[in-house]
Each structure stands twice: as C-alpha cells, then as structure tokens.
Design a protein with these regions (language model features):
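Bacterial N-terminal signal peptides that target proteins for export
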Residues: 1-11
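Acidic/charged, solvent-exposed loop-and-adjacent secondary-structure segments enriched in E/D, K/R, S/T
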Residues: 123-149
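Beta-strand/loop-rich accessory regions of lumenal/periplasmic or secreted enzymes
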Residues: 139-177
Length: 252
C-alpha cells in the first residue's frame, strides 16, 4: 500500500524519526534547538451515541523543540449538570512519556510519569486530598490511551504508521502487518496490549459527504474499533466507529 509523502511531516513530528529527512546528528541538534513550536493539529471531535451528540472533545497538538504536547478538553453536551474533563500529555521527540495529567470538573485528578524503570500513577479523588500511588511495570515508551480522549488514538495511529511506512520512490510504502502496543489507561488504572492494523482505503460518509479515507482497525481484549484518517491531510483522524457501544466520533 502506498500513500502520498505529504503525510510524512505529521507522522514524523510525533514518532517517526525514521521518516525524517536524513541529516548529520549535529545539524539535527542545532535545528531542534532553534525550531519554534509548531501546531501539528487542532480542532474538535463530536461524540455521538445512537445518533445524538453527547460530548465534544476540543484538542491541540504542538511540536516543540524536544517534545510534543497534546492537550484535550472533553465537555458533555447532554444532562442537567454536564461534566468536563481535561488532559495534558507531554512526550519526548522519540515518543517517550514525560508526563500525563488528567482532571475533571466534578473533582478528582491524576498524574502519570516515569519513575526509574516503571511508570507511576498518582490519583487524587474528590473526597481525599492525599494521592494514592500505583506503579506499572511498563517502559516510558508505552502509549497513553485514556478514556474519552480520541486525540490519543490519533497519536497512536501516527506511531503505528511511523513504524509501518517507509519512503520509497517518492511515495510512502506501508506494510499491512499489525502492530502491537503496550498502553496505559490512567482513568481505569490499568494497562493492556492493543493491536492496530492497516486495512486500506474506503469510501465513507463524513458529515454527509462521501470521502475516500484510510481505515485502520484498533483491537483489544474487549473492544474492536474502526478508525479512518485522511492521507491527504497528514493522516488526521476523521472518524471513529465503536459498534458495540453504538458510538460514532466525527471530526467537526
């Protein structure tokens, strides 16, 4: 499967050192020091349950000199007392975790960060100011895939494609072999393995318009999702389908 090289920039920004234009290490170091923060992606996703919009996720992804920062805010659009959540994910240029933070308007927060050879999660509940701690025997290269934040799925797609795709003859050649990832779900205080696989191009309706997008499947022990990204626009996530939950997520 081949795709336009125009998408390489976004793939490279978060996890694709192998796809970056080759240069001497000293030159890259100097360029990294001088590079200003760059907006990689921003926007919002509408989250629909049985066809009704129930929440909106607003997000931004910034590439800085030596790190990437992914910020997201989730706001419920239904209910008399809607709850909002926000998350901040910071990673190194090679995709290793620096820090993850989550909080919600009704109280409660958590942080995750590397601690020696494992990850440490600190959880503060609305009823207690003293945080509980939970270690995970996982490397800092593990992906964060928290509940309700679909931008985390976009970052995982880029990470998968960074490993699966290589420049060849002016195009990007992608293997369709599945990729396995160890991920942490901070709100659930659990870790798991997930598998992502490139399916290929499909025509699908997005906001009433037929689009040709690239489909990937994301699977775990108890879930099976379909994700569609736009190869013409830096592999940005456009749609997610979660059939078991009657849920669809669409970029606004």
């Amino acid at each position: 499967v081949k795709f336009d090289l125009r998408i390489v920039r976004s793939v490279a920004l978060l996890a694709a050192a192998s796809l970056a234009v080759s240069a001497p290490a000293s030159d890259k170091k100097n360029q990294a020091k001088a590079a200003p923060a760059q907006a990689v992606d921003s926007g919002s996703f509408g989250i629909f349950l049985k066809g009704a919009r129930v929440a909106t996720e607003t997000f931004s992804i910034q590439q800085e000199a030596n790190s990437s920062v992914i910020k997201s805010q989730l706001k419920q659009t239904a209910g008399s007392d809607p709850v909002s959540q926000k998350s901040d994910l910071e990673m190194t240029a090679s995709g290793e975790l620096i820090r993850y933070e989550w909080s919600q308007s009704s109280g409660g927060s958590l942080t995750v960060f590397p601690n020696n050879e494992f990850l440490l999660e600190k959880i503060t509940t609305a009823s207690s100011s003293k945080p509980a701690e939970q270690p995970f025997l996982m490397p800092s290269s593990s992906a964060i895939l928290d509940n309700n934040f679909f931008v985390h799925r976009e970052v995982l797609v880029w990470r998968y494609l960074a490993a699966a795709c290589k420049p060849e003859g002016g195009a990007l050649k992608c293997q369709q072999d599945p990729g396995d990832f160890g991920v942490l779900v901070p709100q659930d205080r659990t870790s798991m393995h997930v598998r992502m696989e490139l399916v290929g191009k499909e025509k699908i309706a997005v906001r009433g318009t037929d689009r040709e997008l690239m489909r990937l499947n994301l699977k775990g022990d108890d879930f099976d999702w379909a994700l569609w990204v736009d190869e013409q626009d830096h592999f940005k996530l456009m749609r997610v389908a979660i059939p078991a939950d009657n849920t669809v997520v669409v970029r606004d």
